[in-house]
Design a protein with these regions (language model features):
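Acidic, polar-rich low-complexity tracts and alpha-helical solenoid repeat scaffolds
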Residues: 19-459
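Hydrophobic alpha-helical membrane-insertion segments, chiefly the h-region
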Residues: 14-18
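Sec-dependent N-terminal signal peptides
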Residues: 4-13
Length: 459
């Protein structure tokens, strides 16, 4: 680390000769009433002198060279002075950049940022400042030295160990041309792509700055989606919702509108209990974006709200059926049918319809072993409840026949044995099923239990 700090100090001294060079994409800085140089602005007698950009930058060079002052009054005063000075430097640099970015001496001030964060050992901030320099000032005369010092920093500081290779790649592959707004967005994408939790608040700060500068550009909606995503991951659901609302209001023709509409519905459903509003969002989503990859989930959520929140069973069944008929191969399809069968059996007391629904799952989705097993066992249980024991056994045995050797088949065989022994009073049939367990599941606890049961029944 000492080597890196020394290199930056040397760089600070030797770069003074080029400190007046323009930044990348330099433009003439105009002052009041369009004057090209603030010094050309006529002054009224007795009025204060208007500071120029050069004056401001000259002060920042002095500030950057300033070191914490020692004090003999109180122990710890030096440490506080160091912290206060470091924070003050960053505030001044940030103020300058808000006024003059990306022109004038912005690249020099961005370099000051990097060095100040290193001095303060704020490694996350130094990382961000380094990436920002490389992405935003590709034509700067300072770039080569900044990158070289950056490599030293990444190599010597343990903080960067886990992401070192990624960061080196980003430094090497940063865009070398293109409009500043495009490079800024690529910088945001690079930071977001690191997936570093420590960078989340810094990403948010930079995304808001991007929006301050470029809210009129198409990619602003993407920046808003990134901000909302960070808020969601932090549990800041209300602010995320407001960001989605802002996106839909300000960028109604953007590609991100669909995702914002869908995510708004999810938040209203899951976090705020606004079920009517959520349903309205999902219906609007289905109407406007019928080919979107989230349409099946949106339809499923409409059904789930009618089911779980409004207890409107008939409507819920109808909405679940839309999932099944419109999206027959989706992940929500079998789940919807299972819930339809459950509603029919437990809410509407339509046992026959429920059994038919469960058998429909078995016939239409035979490759879904776990869910088909669940459906057939539910059907068997309904037959047991109505004392139709032979039919119940038939349902359970389908599981064994279709999915032999599975846990579901084992449970189904046990159920058959119990019915034969306890309900139908056919010990021979019970022994027959128990023998299958012993044969097909050797060495298991269930097999040992079945063997003991066989001995007892054969007495």
């Amino acid at each position: 680390m000492k080597k890196y700090l020394t290199s930056f100090l040397i760089f600070s001294a030797t770069s003074a000769a080029i400190a007046h060079a323009p930044a990348d994409s330099v433009a003439i800085q105009t002052g009041i009433d369009g004057a090209e140089n603030e010094k050309d602005i006529p002054k009224e007698p007795g009025t204060a002198t208007v500071a120029s950009e050069q004056d401001y930058f000259d002060f920042l060079r002095i500030l950057h060279a300033e070191q914490p002052k020692k004090s003999g009054h109180l122990l710890g005063r030096l440490a506080r002075s160091s912290k206060d000075l470091g924070e003050h430097k960053i505030s001044e640099y940030d103020t300058y950049l808000k006024i003059y970015f990306p022109n004038a001496h912005s690249d020099h001030v961005q370099r000051f940022m990097i060095e100040s964060f290193v001095d303060q050992e704020k490694w996350d901030e130094a990382e961000l400042a380094l990436l920002k320099f490389v992405y935003l000032y590709p034509n700067s005369a300072l770039k080569k030295t900044v990158i070289e010092n950056g490599y030293v920093l990444l190599e010597e500081e343990d903080y960067y160990q886990s992401d070192r290779d990624k960061l080196v790649t980003l430094l090497q592959e940063a865009p070398r041309s293109g409009e500043i707004q495009n490079r800024y967005f690529k910088f945001l994408s690079a930071v977001h792509g690191l997936r570093d939790p420590k960078l989340k608040p810094l990403f948010k700060r930079e995304a808001w700055e991007y929006l301050r500068l470029y809210s009129h550009l198409p990619r602003a909606s993407k920046a808003l989606m990134g901000l909302a995503g960070v808020d969601l991951s932090n549990g800041a659901h209300h602010s995320a919702l407001m960001i989605y609302e802002k996106l839909m209001t300000m960028y109604p023709t953007s590609r991100e509108f669909a995702s914002a509409l869908f995510q708004s519905g999810k938040l209203k459903q899951e976090q705020f209990g606004e079920y009517n509003e959520a349903t309205a969002n999902f219906r609007q989503f289905l109407k406007q974006f019928p080919e979107h990859r989230f349409v099946a989930e949106a339809q499923y959520r409409i059904a789930a709200i009618a089911d779980q929140n409004f207890n409107d069973w008939t409507t819920a069944i109808g909405e679940y059926e839309k999932v099944v008929t419109q999206h027959p191969t989706n992940v929500y399809t079998i789940t919807s049918l299972l819930r339809v069968g459950e509603i029919q059996a437990t809410k509407l007391r339509q046992e026959e319809e429920a059994i038919a629904t469960y058998n429909r799952i078995a016939s239409e989705y035979p490759d879904s072993t776990v869910q088909v097993t669940k459906a057939l066992q539910r059907a068997g249980k309904l037959y047991e409840k109505s004392k139709e024991y032979e039919e119940a056994i038939a349902q359970y045995m389908v599981v064994h026949e279709k999915y032999p050797g599975t846990e579901g088949a084992l449970v189904s065989l046990e159920k058959c044995a119990v019915i034969y022994e306890k309900k139908i009073k056919r010990k021979d049939k019970a022994v027959e099923k128990l023998n299958i367990i012993v044969k097909e599941y050797p060495g298991t606890k269930k097999a040992k239990k079945a063997a003991k049961r066989i001995k007892k029944l054969n007495k």
